[in-house]
A protein has these predicted regions:
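Active-site-proximal helices and loops of the catalytic beta/alpha 8
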Residues: 1-58, 129-155, 186, 208-210
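Aromatic/acidic polysaccharide-binding cleft in carbohydrate-active enzymes
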Residues: 5, 60-92, 108-147
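Residues at the C-termini of beta-strands that transition into short coil/loop
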Residues: 15, 62, 218-221
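Aromatic-anchored helix/helix-loop segment that forms the rim or "lid"
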Residues: 31-46, 80-104, 162
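Non-transmembrane alpha-helical segments in soluble domains
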Residues: 47, 59, 71, 108-112, ...
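Carbohydrate-interacting/catalytic domains
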Residues: 100-101, 113-120, 124-232
Length: 232
């Protein structure tokens, strides 16, 4: 009711956050399995119920001052430490941090590639950790930022500005099953395709493709096209 003309023009898209983190972790908030098809269903529910302008301009987010840090959620244990004192002292192990950073990079790509307005909570791009408030509101780690993660966020922001299809392109689902997700953003002859694999094993996806070329805009490489199909 808030988006039908007499209340607000847009909302903080917490349902996107819930679905995105569940997909990246492979489990929902109630610990049941959660795959790409569940993420697609959640997003289609939003698309069906929101006016089109609201869906394509929603304030998409992964973290806020009211939520635990995404790196802690994506790299930490399924069950948080029991006491507030334990949560305040908690830090990811080196192995868990590597796992969490890999997921955060995927989360950032999903945030910047999906329809809506990508919003980053300060410090998430620098690799800050922390459970709930006030543990998630630490000072910015000046001089101790995760430079690789920062560069990843900056690159995604640059691509978003350079590619109109990522700003306002139509959403088209290409694949959504288990850990594998692929969708395209299309606008006036330009197509941007995002592909994700949250599993632990490499996988190959065969997607329909109509352009004569396919550039990997993140790495500068190319993907093979054979008989009108893109292999990633």
């Amino acid at each position: 009711k808030y988006l039908l003309g007499s209340e607000t023009h847009g909302l903080m898209n917490y349902p996107f956050r819930t679905a995105a983190l569940s997909y990246l972790l492979g489990r929902s908030e109630d610990a049941s399995p959660y795959g790409a098809e569940d993420f697609r269903e959640a997003m289609e529910t939003i698309r069906e119920n929101y006016p089109r302008p609201a869906f394509y301009s929603a304030m998409n987010l992964l973290g806020t001052h009211d939520t635990p840090r995404i790196l802690t959620l994506l790299g930490g244990p399924e069950t948080p430490p029991a006491t507030r004192r334990e949560r305040a002292a908690f830090r990811l192990s080196p192995e868990a941090r590597v796992r969490g950073l890999r997921r955060v990079r995927m989360a950032a790509l999903l945030l910047y590639a999906f329809p809506g307005s990508p919003t980053v909570f300060y410090g998430d791009e620098a690799g800050m950790e922390g459970w709930e408030d006030p543990m998630n509101r630490g000072t910015f780690p000046w001089g101790r930022e995760d430079r690789e993660l920062q560069a990843h966020f900056l690159r995604l922001g640059t691509l978003r500005r350079q590619r109109p299809s990522l700003q306002s392109g139509e959403l088209r689902w290409l694949y959504a099953e288990g850990p594998l997700l692929a969708f395209a953003r299309e606008l006036e002859g330009e197509t941007s395709t995002a592909v994700f694999n949250t599993g632990t094993s490499p996988a190959c996806l065969e997607l329909p493709w109509y352009a004569p070329f396919s550039d990997d805009v993140l790495t500068g490489g190319k993907f093979p096209i054979i008989d009108g199909k893109l292999f990633v």
